[in-house]
């Protein structure tokens, strides 16, 4: 049949010669229809304007011509406009600034080219307060008080230096004493060391430290580049100009996409005191040791460049240091402008006013670092051209490094590799691999901005001249930046000002809310598993390797994956403070959830933190300064000639009707805290001699408090309190296991076994080793062999109590070792119970059970254990469960004469009944084997 079809086709082709073939363009196309969608990929169609004439039939146009075509249109993602919420209610009138405020939040950032939000998020109006302003001035004691409220040492008054910052210490002076015998210039760029740093935006902000303050000490440091020494400010612990920069320490990195350049900063990275949720901040590291140095505008430029075509990136960077510095750890002098901003903060918490501190002065300050510059360029290459060049990733980045050294850094001994000039990409540009890039993006830090910008270039433009690098390098000495720095939270500086503790706590609370504005959980899903990044009020998409487009909606021909990577949704609100003074919040991996083999979300799903709550009447925020013990206490005790003072409750108890004085004959009731119960007579009576008549009463624990588990572990079931006998289990993310016991039981006053602080998650080596084999075995190729107890059981596995029947000794072993020994047919080791061996009823029954097992006709493997005649294996727990004596089959060969309890008569039982009775912990003595 197939042969006849081929012959028919050949004959048909022969009949249709060139003169008879249909010229399809004889029938023109109609206009393209309008797109079915305005965005998010629609379709449009067009049809041929066919006329069924003689030409149409004679030339087989119906068979040869395409009558309709369709194409994709408006593939760009639909824009999302930024949307603001309504203003909330007016706040209470702040008694210190005499204003009230109302705020609103961004409900949705703009994305995919939507309209941005430009309206303010806060408004205020004057008001008449109903509370008193409780800000108190700091007592300077024997120090000099500046007009700004700052306290400085008395010896600094009238020394010819502006130590107050407002010059109030130099007024009305007679004779002035000098500190230094001659004048000294400040260290170049010393003000930069005192700038705040906005960790979330990745840029310096306002001055927080006054590095012009010298503290009345003439301390100087010399530089080899200057003849006169520089004056060292009081805030600096150490400064060193003798910094060596190697000629050839140029580093190169290759990136398939920009996602590795986007750094995920967690709580620890933010520093103690400013803990918040995990969120992504675009960071470009200035060197290996650098904490961070970011350029959000440069990052945005790189994202936009990558969206135009499928790209790879090569980054070239070199650090040039002028000096190193270290700040003091305490007694830092704040800048006058920062001090004034702190002093103007209200005592009553106001999110908008406190958040302005972070906008103006950043979130952190520099504790150490270097002044200098970073030569840092990001070269964008077409992924297709780079692939066609024939170079590997390692060869490509090496070629850029070599050409940079030769062209800009003037390194004398630079060997040019043959592959760098003769590959297909370099040959298009006269042997220059660098000019084969689409563009380079300047991430340069330090130096004059004009020189830094001139180091970048774009295809089609002239390559930067050789002197551009030397001009920039020379300008770094006069215009350095802070690089290779370490940070500390700005809240650490809020000390020795009025109400420092109150304001410090308010700032920490404000930061938690402020940081949420940078969390990309608010962004919509990016196409093709693009990574969303929140930049201001706009969401951007960082494209995966092999995707491009304004929103990563386009794919390279070789990108075939349909996997959707998971991304975190936003954190829930914090729960209320519970009885353990802890609160928690959660988030879900549903923005989107991983699909079709996509990556799971990285990071923790649940967070916990310490919390407090107040039982005092709210008369306004108290002013708490450093070194003050402000506690919730009652009024001072009043003198009384009759009645009883407040009695002392038992440990873990309190008095229901608590007060300072009680009348004669009055009773008080003793209650216990949550998790405890009162045992004894709970009432005390006040006697005429001002003593209390009270019986024995104590608060005994009935429940266990929720334990604090190390970070990374998940506790289940999650409850505030657990009853005695309840168990909890600790688990790790998929592929990891707990490096210690995972199951714990509430035993009254503590958890058994004790929960160690050193618990963590580690790679699940044993499961990987076991493969598809039975417990105690490992997979070698396609075969299953017994594990070696010595070589394969080095990682943690559950502790169990084991009896060696040869020596009659019992000891604690790992489950891995027991299973491996059983696989090797070691008959002398027997499972006793889960957990370490400890004297008690559990161990006693375990040993007796093993003795009885010698008479058992049933030996059923069950988890670590072997079940005998009087037991069955639980399918859910893989543990042996005792039968009831009535469930045992009567008769059999294994019979015993036993005496139960105080009965004088013997009774005949089989092995199942004997084991069941003993398992039920009933008193029994085996008189002899056989019938009575």
UniProtKB/Swiss-Prot annotation:
GO biological process terms, semicolon-separated: complement activation; complement activation, classical pathway; innate immune response; killing of cells of another organism
Domain EGF-like: from-to ranges: 523-553
Residue ranges of the TM segments: 278-290, 402-415
Alphabetized InterPro entries for the sequence: C6_KAZAL, C8A_B_C6_EGF-like, FacI_MAC, Kazal_dom, LDL_receptor-like_sf, LDLR_class-A_CS, LDrepeatLR_classA_rpt, MAC_perforin
A GO CC annotation given for this chain: extracellular space
Positions of the LDL-receptor class A domain: 139-174
Renumbered residue ranges of the record's region CCP 2: 689-765
Membrane topology of this protein: Multi-pass membrane protein
Modifications made to the protein after synthesis: All cysteine residues are assumed to be cross-linked to one another. Individual modules containing an even number of conserved cysteine residues are supposed to have disulfide linkages only within the same module.
Annotated residues for binding of Ca(2+): 156, 159, 161, 163, 169-170
Disulfide bridge map: 22-61, 24-65, 35-73, 39-78, 82-117, 93-127, 96-133, 140-151, 146-164, 158-173, 180-218, 399-420, 499-623, 521-570, 523-539, 526-541, 543-552, 577-611, 589-601, 644-686, 672-699, 704-746, 732-761, 773-823, 784-801, 786-837, 793-816, 862-873, 867-919, 880-897, 882-932, 888-912
All residue ranges annotated as the Kazal-like domain in the record: 780-839, 876-932
Glycan attachment sites: 29, 32, 38, 90, 324, 392, 568, 571, 574, 859
Activity: how regulated: Membrane attack complex (MAC) assembly is inhibited by CD59, thereby protecting self-cells from damage during complement activation. MAC assembly is also inhibited by clusterin (CLU) chaperones that inhibit polymerization of C9.
Top-rank lineage group of the source organism: Eukaryota
Cited Pfam families: EGF_C8A_B_C6 (PF21195), Kazal_C6 (PF21288), Ldl_recept_a (PF00057), MACPF (PF01823), Sushi (PF00084), TSP_1 (PF00090)
Region of interest (Factor I module (FIM) 2), residue spans: 858-932
Region (C5b-binding domain): 642-932
Record localization: Secreted; Target cell membrane
Domain Sushi: 642-701, 702-763
CDD domains given in the database record: CCP, LDLa
Similarity-based family: Belongs to the complement C6/C7/C8/C9 family.
Oligomeric and partner information: Component of the membrane attack complex (MAC), composed of complement C5b, C6, C7, C8A, C8B, C8G and multiple copies of the pore-forming subunit C9.
Record-given protein name: Complement component C6
Species of origin: Bos taurus
């Amino acid at each position: 049949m197939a042969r006849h079809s081929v012959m028919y086709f050949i004959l048909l082709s022969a009949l249709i010669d060139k003169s008879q073939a249909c010229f399809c363009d004889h029938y023109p196309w109609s206009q393209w229809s309008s797109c079915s969608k305005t965005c998010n990929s629609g379709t449009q169609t067009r049809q041929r304007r066919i006329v069924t004439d003689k030409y149409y039939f004679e030339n087989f146009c119906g068979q040869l011509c395409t009558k309709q075509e369709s194409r994709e249109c408006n593939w760009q993602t639909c824009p999302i406009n930024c949307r603001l919420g309504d203003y909330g209610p007016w706040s209470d009138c702040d008694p210190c600034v005499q204003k009230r405020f109302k705020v609103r939040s961004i409900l949705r950032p703009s994305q995919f080219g939507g309209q941005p939000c430009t309206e303010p998020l806060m408004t205020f109006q004057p008001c008449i307060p109903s509370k008193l302003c409780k800000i108190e001035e700091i007592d300077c004691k024997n120090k000099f008080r500046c007009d700004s409220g700052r306290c400085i040492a008395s010896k600094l008054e009238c020394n010819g230096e502006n130590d107050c910052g407002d010059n109030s210490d130099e007024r009305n002076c007679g004779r002035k004493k000098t500190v230094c015998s001659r004048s000294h210039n400040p260290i170049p760029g010393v003000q930069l060391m005192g700038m705040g740093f906005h960790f979330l935006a990745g840029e310096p902000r306002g001055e927080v430290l006054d590095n012009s303050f010298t503290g009345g000490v003439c301390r100087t440091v010399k530089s080899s580049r200057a003849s006169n020494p520089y004056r060292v400010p009081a805030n600096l612990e150490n400064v060193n100009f003798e910094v060596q920069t190697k000629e050839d320490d140029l580093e190169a990195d290759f990136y398939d996409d920009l996602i590795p350049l986007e750094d995920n900063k967690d709580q620890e990275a933010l520093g103690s005191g400013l803990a918040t949720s995990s969120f992504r901040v675009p960071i470009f590291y200035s060197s290996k040791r650098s904490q961070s140095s970011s350029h959000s505008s440069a990052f945005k430029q790189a994202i936009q460049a990558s969206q135009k075509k499928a790209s790879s990136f090569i980054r070239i960077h070199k650090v040039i240091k002028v000096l190193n510095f270290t700040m003091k750890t305490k007694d830092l002098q704040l800048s006058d402008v920062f001090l004034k901003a702190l002093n103007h903060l209200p005592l009553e918490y106001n999110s908008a006013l406190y958040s302005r501190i972070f906008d103006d002065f950043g979130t952190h300050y520099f504790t150490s670092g270097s002044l200098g510059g970073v030569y840092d360029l990001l070269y964008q290459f077409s992924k297709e051209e780079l692939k066609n060049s024939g170079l590997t990733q390692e060869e490509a980045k090496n070629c850029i490094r070599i050409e940079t050294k030769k062209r800009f850094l003037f390194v004398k001994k630079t060997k040019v590799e043959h592959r760098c000039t003769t590959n297909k990409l370099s040959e298009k540009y006269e042997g220059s691999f660098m000019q084969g890039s689409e563009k380079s993006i300047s991430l340069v830090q330090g130096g004059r901005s004009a020189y830094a910008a001139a180091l970048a270039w774009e295809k089609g433009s002239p390559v930067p001249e050789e002197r551009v690098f030397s001009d920039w390098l020379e300008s770094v000495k006069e215009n350095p930046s802070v690089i290779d720095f370490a940070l500390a939270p700005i809240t650490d500086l809020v000390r020795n000002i009025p109400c420092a503790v109150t304001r410090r706590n308010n700032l920490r609370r404000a930061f938690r809310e402020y940081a949420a504005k940078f969390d990309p959980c608010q962004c919509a899903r990016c196409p093709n598993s693009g990574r969303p990044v929140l930049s201001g009020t706009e969401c951007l998409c960082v494209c995966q390797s092999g995707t491009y487009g304004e929103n990563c909606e386009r794919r390279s021909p070789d990108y075939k994956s349909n996997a959707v990577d998971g991304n975190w949704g936003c954190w829930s609100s914090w729960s209320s403070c519970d009885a353990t003074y802890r609160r928690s919040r959660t988030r879900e991996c549903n923005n989107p959830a991983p699909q079709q083999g996509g990556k799971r979300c990285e990071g923790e799903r649940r967070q916990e933190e310490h919390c407090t709550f107040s039982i005092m009447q709210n008369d306004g925020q108290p002013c708490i300064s450093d070194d003050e013990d402000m506690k919730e206490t009652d009024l001072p005790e009043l003198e009384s000639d009759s009645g009883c003072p407040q009695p002392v409750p038992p440990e873990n108890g309190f008095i229901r009707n608590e007060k300072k004085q009680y009348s004669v004959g009055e009773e008080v009731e003793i209650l216990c805290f949550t998790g405890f119960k009162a045992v004894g007579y709970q009432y005390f009576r006040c006697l005429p001699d001002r003593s209390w008549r009270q019986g024995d009463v104590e608060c005994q624990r009935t429940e266990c408090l929720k334990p604090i588990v190390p970070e990374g572990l998940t506790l289940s079931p999650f409850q505030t309190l657990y009853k005695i006998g309840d168990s909890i289990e600790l688990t790790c993310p998929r592929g990891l296991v707990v490096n210690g016991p995972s199951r714990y039981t509430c035993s009254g006053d503590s958890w058994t076994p004790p929960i160690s602080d050193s618990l963590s998650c580690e790679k699940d080596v044993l499961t990987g080793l076991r493969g598809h084999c039975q417990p105690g075995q490992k997979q070698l190729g396609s075969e299953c062999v017994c594990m070696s107890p010595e070589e394969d059981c080095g990682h943690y596995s559950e502790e169990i109590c084991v009896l060696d029947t040869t020596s009659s000794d019992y000891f604690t072993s790992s489950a891995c070792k027991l299973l491996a020994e059983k696989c090797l047919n070691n008959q002398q080791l027997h499972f006793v119970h889960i957990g370490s061996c400890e004297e008690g009823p559990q161990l006693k029954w375990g040993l007796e059970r093993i003795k009885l097992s010698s008479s058992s006709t049933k030996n059923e493997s069950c988890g670590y254990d072997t079940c005998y005649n009087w037991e069955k294996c639980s399918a859910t727990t893989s543990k042996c469960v005792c039968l009831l004596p009535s469930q045992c089959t009567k008769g059999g060969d294994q019979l015993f004469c036993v005496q139960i309890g105080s009965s004088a008569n013997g009774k005949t039982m089989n092995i199942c009944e004997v084991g069941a009775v003993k398992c039920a912990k009933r008193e029994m003595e085996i008189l002899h084997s056989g019938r009575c």
